[in-house]
Amino acid sequence: MESRTSRRTFVKGLAAAGVLGGLGLWRSPSWAASGSPALSVLSGTEFDLSIGEMPVNITGRRRTAMAINGGLPGPLLRWKEGDTVTLRVRNRLDAATSIHWHGIILPPNMDGVPGLSFAGIEPGGVYVYQFKVQQNGTYWYHSHSGFQEQVGVYGPLVIEAKEPEPFKYDSEHVVMLTDWTDEDPVSLMRTLKKQSDYYNFHKRTVGDFVNDVADKGWAATVADRKMWAEMKMNPTDLADVSGATYTYLLNGQAPNMNWTGLFRPGEKLRLRFINGSAMTYFDIRIPGLKMTVVASDGQFVNPVEVDELRIAVAETFDVIVEPTAEAYTVFAQSMDRTGYARGTLAVREGLVAQVPPLDPRPLVTMDDMGMGGMDHGSMDGMSGMDSGADDGMQTMSSMGGDSMPAMDHSKMSTMQGMDHGAMSGMDHGAMGGMVMQSHPASENDNPLVDMQAMSPTAKLNDPGLGLRNNGRKVLTYADLKSTFEDPDGREPSRTIELHLTGHMEKFAWSFDGIKFADAQPLILKYGERVRIVLVNDTMMTHPIHLHGMWSDLEDEDGNFRVRKHTIDMPPGSKRSYRVTADALGRWAYHCHLLYHMEMGMFREVRVEE
């Protein structure tokens, strides 16, 4: 059955076939019989990787990507648990570069974060990464320098287990989801700083107002619009960067390129999903197939059968499916419903299955943001929040690509000051029976914090915005349970609470209202077990990643649930996890939305004796 797609999407698909060999530096990618490029695979213990520019044509316009070994994505690396791997990374760019091995436990000087782990790889230079592989599962790797991840410096990573895995399968495919823009990422960032909702082409219309009046009444609808206007936010702004500029790729291919993964009817097929995008959350389903989730972030979980799952930026999920028909669509729609990545599982090349329409666009509500129970008619005071010009912008070298030089996290730019007394207009008496969330003093009177969650909750059993009550079984964090008990076993000796903060209009992001350059490192004592509590004081969803150590997610009662390397934090959520400080050194800790990290949602963690 043929799918329906727009002409624009079709052109993108055809244009993606024009990926070139590139500047004499690269071999041409291999192509399957259908015209779909195959992932290059490198395995063993010795690897040579080269990062350089590569001309591409994904949307009908010629652009320059940065690529690893001439591929977009880079080669699939296959390691074996227990081996020592050596990776020689050569920089053929005109700028410094780096490779970070996401979720991999290794020495700090092998972690690949310029300014913390090492100095970076200068143009023409070579850096040799060497470390023992201590884990197994599905991971990925990417640049931690500037915006290089956005323009192609990333690739998938699979580590074969030393011991038998707790499930059986017959064959497998790696499915890496990414987002591509023809814009210069520096220009894109400038645009967000000038107008943070520039890429939101789905603002509410007069027609929406009329419909809301019919559903909710005049007074409630006017109060709702007034409240959002005073907060200088938009309930349709689920993603800072949308399909207005992004083309969503599956294994480097636009939707109409029809990436195809072959299977034999009746076999058990393992799919290793990786979200390697810069900014995009994806909701994944395969119409006609149940997915049995068996691993999250490379770690085995008790099997759970679902129809759909949301994958945060930087997360990985392994699922097993048992296809019997000739063809199925792998459908990954963006969380804001502005586009999708798509591929096909089929018994032979050239087949397609029906592509479902995008789901309705969700809206963020006050309840979503942890504001449940507020008298929203009394929020006039929120208009007092300082939404003036961002003085810190001038420190970013006019966004000339070196706002965080090569992501040198010892030199990130500054923003300071806050005005937060404006929350006085809220009717806190309307929140009787709720536990009011406290907030750090650094958020008060801070012009770079535009909201605070009043009653955040863990939301572990919440499918998320746009996925509730959709008639499908959707994976939640409450469904995830590691196949092992808490590997440490100790109760945390202390708790560290951090708030995810930001200002939508100014496109400013931070922890506790303090940008990275103004923040002191978080100090952990070597060997201690700590509990980290995160509170999301923004209307955005943030994937939070700690380098070098595992994040052991807890339930609301403080019981160990699942081991992760990236913790998804929806709006209005409060989640806790345990960390064993077993890795001496300096480590990055940040939001994995690239432009949020670039704008300051980043901290250094130091593990000291």
Curated annotation (Swiss-Prot):
Job of this protein: Mediates copper resistance by sequestration of copper in the periplasm along with the copper-binding protein CopC. May have oxidase activity.
Keywords, sorted A to Z: Copper, Metal-binding, Oxidoreductase, Periplasm, Plasmid, Repeat, Signal
Description of post-translational modifications: Predicted to be exported by the Tat system. The position of the signal peptide cleavage has been experimentally proven.
Regulation: induction: By copper.
GO cellular component, one term: periplasmic space
InterPro entries noted in UniProt: Cu-oxidase-like_N (IPR011707), Cu-oxidase_2nd (IPR001117), Cu-oxidase_C (IPR011706), Cu-oxidase_fam (IPR045087), Cu-R_CopA (IPR006376), Cu_oxidase_CS (IPR033138), Cu_oxidase_Cu_BS (IPR002355), Cupredoxin (IPR008972)
Pfam families (UniProt xref): Cu-oxidase, Cu-oxidase_2, Cu-oxidase_3
Residues involved in Cu cation 3 binding: 144, 547, 590
Family from the record: Belongs to the multicopper oxidase family. CopA subfamily.
Organism domain of life: Bacteria
Residues where Cu cation 1 binds: 100, 545
Signal sequence range: 1-32
Lineage: Bacteria, Pseudomonadati, Pseudomonadota, Gammaproteobacteria, Pseudomonadales
GO MF, one example: copper ion binding
5 X 8 AA tandem repeats of D-H-X-X-M-X-G-M: annotated segments: 367-434
Protein name in the entry: Copper resistance protein A
Sequence repeat ranges per the UniProt record: 367-374, 375-382, 408-415, 419-426, 427-434
Residues reported to bind Cu cation 4: 542, 591, 596, 601
Amino acids binding Cu cation 2: 102, 142, 592
Organism: Pseudomonas syringae pv. tomato
Compartments, as annotated in UniProt: Periplasm
